[in-house]
A protein has these predicted regions:
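Glycine-rich segments within core transmembrane alpha-helices of 12-TM secondary carriers
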Residues: 17-43, 67, 249-261
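Cytoplasmic helix-loop-helix junction between adjacent transmembrane helices
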Residues: 1-25
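Multi-pass alpha-helical transporter architecture, strongest
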Residues: 71-78, 232, 283-307
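C-terminal ends and interior cores of transmembrane alpha-helices
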Residues: 190-206
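A late C-terminal transmembrane helix in Major Facilitator Superfamily
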Residues: 236-272
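Helix-loop-helix hairpin linking two adjacent transmembrane segments in secondary transporters
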Residues: 27-75
Length: 307
């Protein structure tokens, strides 16, 4: 949330979607590096080898440590965005003139003044929370356990999907600058409503290339959503609650719906005996996200100080 807010407030308004798409792209790059490493290990040593099981899986975590340290030092050198600094100056001027009372806490302000925006934003973020998990995390496990695909093939498909995700998410951000955030997010939600159940049927064909095409189509639908979501959330809330509104809506959606997606998916399979039961949950979430976006307002191209 912080990274997206920072980028959005620094970006030119007609390219905000493109620049904000760097945030989900950077997340996917981390997953891509991990997937490439896993694919290499599985093909070189075997998925069940002592090297992989005992300590090979730890190597990506060790390599990520220095990146976190580097990010910390970059972060402490950054200055607040011009939009935020302008808000701070306005508050100080108001206090100096005696026109302002005590500043309201952001969380309290969200629930008292921006509750509708918060609820809609949670609905919009739900598709990312569940869609990202289902497409890029759950499906590899599903292919191995339900479709009985070899781990190295499932890992290869995931790697190709992640490359596609990173490549197209910038295009999605750019298109959202051209066509608007609302249209893009509605398109993504509608795509998941229509395509998810047939996609799970096709996954059970056991044909590698059919499964790959299905995964890529779902991945492209996800990029339409994820490449747009960050800029949409930043444009939904005014500067004084922008970070809090983004963080609360996005993280609540991920904690409640994305975090439970694994348990719900496997529980649905166990209860119904239907191997494509997780698709029904994905469609349910997509319907909720679609409703939220239909009820939302378009803010594409606005100056963030005007939101």
């Amino acid at each position: 949330a912080g990274a997206a807010t920072f980028i959005a407030e620094y970006s030119p308004k007609n390219h905000r979607g493109f620049y904000c798409s760097m945030v989900p792209a950077s997340t996917a790059v981390g997953l891509l590096v991990g997937s490439l490493f896993a694919t290499w290990m599985f093909n070189t040593f075997g998925a069940s080898s002592d090297f992989v099981v005992n300590w090979g899986w730890r190597i990506p975590f060790v390599l990520a440590g220095p990146l976190g340290i580097g990010a910390y030092f970059v972060n402490i050198q950054l200055e607040d965005s011009p939009t935020y600094q302008a808000m701070q100056r306005a508050l100080k001027d108001a206090e100096a003139s005696g026109a302002a009372g005590a500043p309201e806490r952001p969380i309290h302000c969200l629930f008292t003044k921006h509750l509708r925006k918060l609820i809609i934003s949670i609905g919009a973020a739900m598709l990312n929370a569940v869609g990202f998990y289902v497409v890029l995390t759950y499906l590899p496990v599903y292919l191995e356990t339900a479709v009985m695909m070899p781990k190295n093939e499932a890992s290869l498909i995931t790697t190709i999907a992640l490359v596609t995700y990173v490549a197209f998410i910038f295009a999605s951000g750019h298109l959202s600058d051209k066509f608007g955030r609302k249209k893009m997010l509605i398109t993504a939600a509608a795509g998941f409503v229509v395509f998810t159940i047939p996609a799970f049927w096709l996954l059970n064909t056991l044909d590698f290339f059919t499964i790959l095409v299905v995964e890529l189509v779902m991945c492209l639908m996800l990029t339409i959503n994820d490449g747009t979501l960050s800029s949409y959330l930043c444009e939904t809330f005014p500067t004084d609650v922008r970070y809090s509104g983004f963080a609360l809506s996005f993280n609540l959606a991920n904690a409640i719906f994305g975090g439970s997606a694994s348990y719900i998916s496997f529980a649905l399979i166990n209860v119904t005996g239907d191997p494509i039961a997780p698709a029904y949950y994905m469609v349910f979430i997509a319907v909720l996200a679609l409703g939220a976006m239909i009820a939302s307002h378009e803010h594409t191209g606005k100056d963030l100080s005007e939101v």
